[in-house]
From Swiss-Prot:
Belongs to the paramyxoviruses fusion glycoprotein family. Residues 518-555 are cytoplasmic. Homotrimer of disulfide-linked F1-F2. It is a single-pass type I membrane protein; Single-pass membrane protein. Residues 138-166, 462-487 form a coiled coil. The keyword Lipoprotein does not apply. Residues 1-21 form the signal peptide. The lineage of its organism: Viruses, Riboviria, Orthornavirae, Negarnaviricota, Haploviricotina. This is Fusion glycoprotein F0. The chain crosses the membrane at residues 497-517. The record marks 112-113 as: Cleavage. Its main location: virion.
Length: 555
């Protein structure tokens, strides 16, 4: 191992250790929170291009037509492999049109395909795949002149590998398949062996090569899309090493390792020549930029028991540590290597303040949810051992399967090779790593943090009912609005106002007439009452005539 590699490993270890000191891993494990070792963050924002021209048929001048039949049969095999690929490329080029803006200066014209306008003829809107294909097509057209030159050079030379440098700094590597075999074995054998033997030997080698070609390059030669380029395809078939191609780029060795480990060397077929039996691959090598002082941790949690109840800490799946600040990380579009996460952009996400305090060791701030089913994990691996909730689970130790009794004051139990050996969790048995250590953190009291709900609630039916109700209410409101609008329009006209005034006047006259009539009736009643109550002089009328019978009797 070289000195630079040793220094890099030491630097990485120190960086990881210094960052882990900020997150109390042992303390968090007591509430079931498991924090794995952090990894670096690298951004893959752009890429460099390389072109590989594969010459599938070797240059060989066979005397007396020796081996011609085998070459023809081999070409027929290649036709069945390459013709569909050629047809797909022609279809792609017919659907995608590229307009290159060219600026003319005192020097040579400069083509700007970073400003290319990509459109589609048959399809109205360009999709992401079409845009990618259009960019690859534009780059292929830019390199077509150089590729044509090296094709001619391949035909004239007997070398198995050719390399040219483009004016813009890109390299085109020409790999001539089977050429070394032809140079070293077939040509010398022509003068020593009979034609049939030489042709048979050549045919066997060509068939073997075709089989290896179809196997190793099946992902690239089976589609016009972008696929990972394997190391075996280049090293075994074409006598080249991908690390040599990568070494031409000024990259750190750790970046090269991450690129190879994550299979980020992408190859796309951009040209198929059925006359010369040559295939051109556009190889993209990402450019990585490490973000200094940033680490990403994978986090998980198991249930823990406290105060006789089972709880589960809600924590992000990934945590990012930037200097003195913590946050979540969305690594959905990232690729994980052994030492780093390679992301197309910064994956940082904001997390609540209580989660930050929880990750920094204040377990009383950890948001928790009460466990009501068995879907929450009950154990996890940590430091070569196992951390488990042995109150909610059945834990055993050793080959005798001795039950583990967890102290009620402790949230979880740590089982290692030293104190347990053979570990059993709910019937699952496993052996701990001999180098594992017991992770303990004092005897401090663990407090339950704020309770939150992380269970997904299905409210689709309620939402549907509410939506229907709102739609019906909207219809009724529109009807009411129409009625109000109709009612509100008639009283604003001038004729209606005049009619209202006349009606009011008539009503006033009628009311006045009624009042006058009532007044007269009342006055008449008053006069009648006064007449009956006044005194009357009574006179008695006596007859002046005497009764004749009375006078006679007196006499």
């Amino acid at each position: 191992m070289q000195k630079s590699e040793i220094l890099f490993l030491i630097y990485s270890s120190l960086l990881l250790s210094s960052s882990l000191c900020q997150i109390p891993v042992d303390k968090l494990s007591n509430v079931g929170v498991i924090i794995n070792e952090g990894k670096l963050l690298k951004i893959a924002g752009s890429y460099e291009s390389r072109y590989i021209v594969l010459s599938l048929v070797p240059s060989i001048d066979l005397e007396d037509g020796c081996g011609t039949t085998q070459i023809i049969q081999y070409k027929n095999l290649l036709n069945r492999l390459l013709i569909p690929l050629k047809d797909a490329l022609d279809l792609q080029e017919s659907l995608i049109t590229i307009t290159n803006d060219t600026t003319v200066t005192n020097d040579n014209p400069q083509s700007r395909f970073f400003g290319a306008v990509i459109g589609t003829i048959a399809l109205g809107v360009a999709t992401a795949a079409q845009i990618t294909a259009g960019i690859a097509l534009a780059e292929a057209r830019e390199a077509r002149k150089d590729i044509a030159l090296i094709k001619d050079s391949i035909i004239k030379t007997h070398n198995s590998v050719e390399l040219i440098q483009r004016g813009i700094g890109e390299q085109i590597i020409a790999l001539k398949t089977l050429q070394d075999f032809v140079n070293n074995e077939i040509r010398p054998a022509i003068g020593e062996l009979r034609c049939e033997t030489t042709a048979l030997k050549l045919g066997i080698k060509l068939t073997q090569h075709y089989s290896e070609l179809a196997t190793a390059f099946s992902s690239n030669l089976g589609t016009i899309g972008e696929k990972s380029l394997t190391l075996q395809a280049l090293s075994s078939l074409y006598s080249a090493n991908i690390t040599e191609i990568l070494s031409t780029i000024k990259k750190d060795k750790s970046d090269i390792y991450d690129i190879i480990y994550t299979e980020q060397v992408k190859g796309t077929v951009i040209d198929v020549d059925l006359e010369k039996y040559m295939v051109t691959l556009l190889v993209k090598i990402p450019i990585l930029s490490e973000i200094p002082g940033v680490l990403i941790y994978r986090a998980s949690s198991i249930s823990y028991n406290i105060e006789g109840e089972e709880w589960h800490v809600a924590i992000p799946n990934y945590i990012i540590n930037k200097a003195s600040s913590l946050g979540g990380a969305d690594v959905t579009n990232c690729i994980e290597s052994r030492l780093a996460y390679i992301c197309p952009r910064d994956p940082t996400q904001l997390i609540p303040d209580n989660q930050q305090k929880c990750i920094l060791g204040d377990v009383s701030k950890c948001p928790v949810t009460k466990v009501i089913n068995n879907l929450v994990p009950k154990f996890a691996f940590i430091n070569g051992g196992v951390v488990a909730n042995c109150i909610a689970s059945t834990c055993t130790c050793g080959t005798n399967r001795i039950p583990v009794n967890q102290d009620r004051s402790r949230g979880v139990t740590f089982l290692t090779y030293t104190n347990c050996g053979l570990i059993g969790i709910n019937g699952i048995e496993l052996y701990a790593n001999k180098r594992g250590r017991d992770t303990t953190w004092g005897n401090q009291i663990i407090k339950v943090g704020p309770a939150v709900s992380i269970r997904p609630v299905d409210i689709s039916l309620n939402l549907a009912s509410a939506t229907n109700f709102l739609e019906e209410s909207k219809i009724e409101l529109m009807k009411a609005k129409a009625i109000i609008s109709a009612v509100g329009g008639w009283h604003n006209t001038e004729s209606t106002q005049i009619i209202i005034i006349i009606i009011v006047c008539i009503l006033i006259i009628i009311i006045c007439g009624i009042l006058y009539y009532l007044y007269r009736v009342r006055r008449l009643l008053v006069m009648i009452n006064s007449t009956h109550n006044s005194p009357v002089n009574t006179y008695t009328l006596e007859s002046r005539m005497r009764n004749p019978y009375i006078g006679n009797n007196s006499n």
